[in-house]
């Protein structure tokens, strides 16, 4: 087992171990890690309130949700420079910085993990009779009005799930993109950003590229999609391949099966002084240095949003094309996120409308025909036309 939850004596918690053993057979290691941490939080909560795991009720789940919404997340080290901006909006990007508390998505994920854990035990007949994470069905039978021509989807949301504020994806403006790209210190970092903003891949997918995954002739890169590990070739811009060529020339010979991205500095982790494959923490450090220099809070996912919004506004690309590049399973996901009216264009049109009203108000009233009183016409028609 790659991940286990241990009790205070150092032994594995048997109910969680059996669940994770079954869960790992059908999910990725990253999902196993995420669920293990979620169950660790739930187990600690049950110990704090003095309730056995198979005696838990919806009251314990409700109280945990209330506690998560009020508590602060534990940190390995205290905040330093980010303490003053935690939870506040950045004036340049207009994005909110992460706060010290648990976000609604974290609470929803916690509820999903606990519900899945009890569904496993109820299914094999060894757990409680009722799942302590109830669904809110609002008094109607699931799939009561299901269309037989459409696939079945899960009905009923978890009762204590908090609502997630819906926000539109933030695009990096062209002038800010130039500043961000100019803040990169190496050809490696420039190649990563240029590649990501042209092919709209996720950060983990970009970092997983190996030498054999680069098609120099057709200017394609092959990524392994998050969730199902499906391989997909994505087109990238000629500029990104220029920066990639410059970086690889500095790196030296690269085996086709080796990762493309390596650390710039050689470090000794017990096997000699050498370079190591670049991981997500190292990539975050690159953006953290650039954000500190520019006073921004951009992330790698902002580059994916920017590329997707650029594609969605291109009349030569269909929504199906954008869905394929982004790797979304459902076309509705792409449409809900990216098929939106440009906020800047809406603001511009409304500003023009307000300015036009001001101009009309300053224009003199048209002359009234001979034989009619202006006051009488105003009463009759509710004001003279402009």
Residue ranges and their predicted role:
Residues 16-31, 40-150, 179:
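N-terminal core-binding DNA-recognition domain of tyrosine recombinases/integrases
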Residues 127-179, 265-274:
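Flexible interdomain linker/hinge and immediately adjacent N-terminus
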Residues 164-166, 170-203, 304:
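Basic, Lys/Arg- and aromatic-enriched nucleic-acid-binding interface segment
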Residues 199, 204, 208-242, 249:
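Conserved tyrosine-mediated DNA breakage-rejoining catalytic core shared by Y-recombinases
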Residues 238-296, 383-386:
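Active-site/catalytic core of tyrosine-dependent DNA strand-transfer enzymes
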Residues 351-386:
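C-terminal secondary-structure termini that scaffold catalytic or DNA-interacting sites
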